[in-house]
Amino acid sequence: MKFKFNKNGNNNFLAKAKVAIIVGYFYQDIGDKLLSAAQETLAKYGINANNINVFYVPGAFEIPLLAKKLASQKLSNKNLYDGIVALGAIINGETPHFEFVCNECARGVSDVSYQYEIPTAFGILTTNNMEQTIGRAGGYKGNKGEKATMAMIEMLYLMQQVDTQTF
C-alpha cells in the first residue's frame, strides 16, 4: 500500500490545523515574498487564516530557538501548533560565517521536527548571491515559501495517517 498526499483530494483534515510561520527579516523583502507564498498555499488548502500565526525574528540563526519554543507549547495536553514553516534567507558572503549559520539553522530546524514530532518545514534560502535568492523567492526558480509550506502540509497528512492508522 502506498501513502501519499493527494493534492486534489479531500483536505478537510486541515480545516482545524494550527500553523506557525517564522520569518527571518534580515532580508525583509525576501522574507515578505516567501511569507506571501506560504500564506497563499495555506489558504489554498483550507487552513483558516485565524489559525495561522506569523512570528518575525532578526535572522535565520534565531529561527530554531523560536521554533523549539513554539513546538513545546501545549494546549489541553496537545501540541498548540500542528505545523511550523521556517522562512528566510542566508546569502554567502566573504567569510565562513555563511557555513556556520546555514549548518546551525538547518540542524536546529530539523531537531525541532524530531524532538517534538511536529512537521517543521525548512523554507530558508541558502544561496551564493542575491540573484539566486530572488530567483527562489518568486523568480525564475519559483517560490520556496510555497514549496516548504507544501512539504509541511504533506507531512501533516502523513503524520495524521500514521497517528490514526486510517490508511
Curated annotation (Swiss-Prot):
Record EC number: 2.5.1.78
Top-level lineage group: Bacteria
Active site feature: H97 (proton donor)
GO-annotated biological processes: riboflavin biosynthetic process
Record's catalysed reaction(s): (2S)-2-hydroxy-3-oxobutyl phosphate + 5-amino-6-(D-ribitylamino)uracil = 6,7-dimethyl-8-(1-D-ribityl)lumazine + phosphate + 2 H2O + H(+)
Pathway(s) the chain acts in: Cofactor biosynthesis; riboflavin biosynthesis; riboflavin from 2-hydroxy-3-oxobutyl phosphate and 5-amino-6-(D-ribitylamino)uracil: step 1/2
Quaternary assembly: Forms an icosahedral capsid composed of 60 subunits, arranged as a dodecamer of pentamers.
Function in brief: Catalyzes the formation of 6,7-dimethyl-8-ribityllumazine by condensation of 5-amino-6-(D-ribitylamino)uracil with 3,4-dihydroxy-2-butanone 4-phosphate. This is the penultimate step in the biosynthesis of riboflavin.
Protein name as annotated: 6,7-dimethyl-8-ribityllumazine synthase
Species this protein is from: Ruthia magnifica subsp. Calyptogena magnifica
